[in-house]
Amino acid sequence: MSGPLVIGHRGASGHRPEHTAAAYRLAWRSGADSVEPDVVATRDGVLVCRHDLELSRTTDVADHPELAHLRRRQVVDGQVEEGWFVHDLDLDQLRTLRARERWPRRRRRSAAFDDRLPILTLAELLELREQESARAGRALGVHVELKHGAHLAGLGLPLVEPLVDLLRQHRLTTALAPLTVMAFEADLLRGLRREVDVDLVQLVDKHQTKALRRGRLHKVGEYATGVGLHKQLALPRDAEGRSTGPGPAVERVQSRGLDVLVWTLRDENRYLPTELQVPGPSRRHGHADREVQALLALGVDGLLCDHPETAVEVISRRTAAVAV
């Protein structure tokens, strides 16, 4: 990994419904180096770009009477959920759906694209990457995140094997490939390491501080090339939501020879530390550029952003200042 990468989180998901071709395309065309698709499997084993297994928050599935019989309640990763699930639909059924904005009140401009954009398969995204790379004149990246791996494997829908097949088809299996795979589930990454040489990133949530102990990081280094930190591990906050200064996580991970990605940067007040918020509603954009600056000062290797243009602009200004 060279330099601070800007990664469009679920595409430019601050501007278009997440995980759609429009969101990914906009991220790349806004200057992002890579995009991040979450990946799960359909009933017939096709890898598709969705964050949640349950579909009603981000698609129009509830408006499809022909699918009403598939609504059910089930436990997913320890949580009871009710609705329509990706793994209960085959690809043909999923293709009848259209994407919707996850937070329509907060992201009204994105919600204007509701019910227009189809669900994308991972294969289609990899093809789109090739097209956009040719257009941009540079190798654009993809940071695949595998979701709900154990749950899907228990249903006979493993993620690793079909992913490896896709990577081989697209010649994206070497350490130099513009593709990274991320996951919270270490077993998924270990399985991939036996098959491909691409960069692998172990994700760590803000409450998983034990994962940052030196012994644990040594084990991560046996299969991964990087760690993806929740941004509050890099820049902790107090009980009032104010930043308390840099935490030790970035230095600790990098001291083990591992790259550091940070997730997820969002420009709205709701997601910023108190001191970077501006007067107005939670959906109003605050001083997100200052959060980017603080993370770059820590020397992070990549940023996952819903509004990638913000990080692109900060990095461009920073690069220009150094060149003077």
Q: Which residue stretches match the model-derived regions?
A:
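Phosphate-group recognition and catalysis centered on beta-loop-alpha active-site segments
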Residues: M1-V324
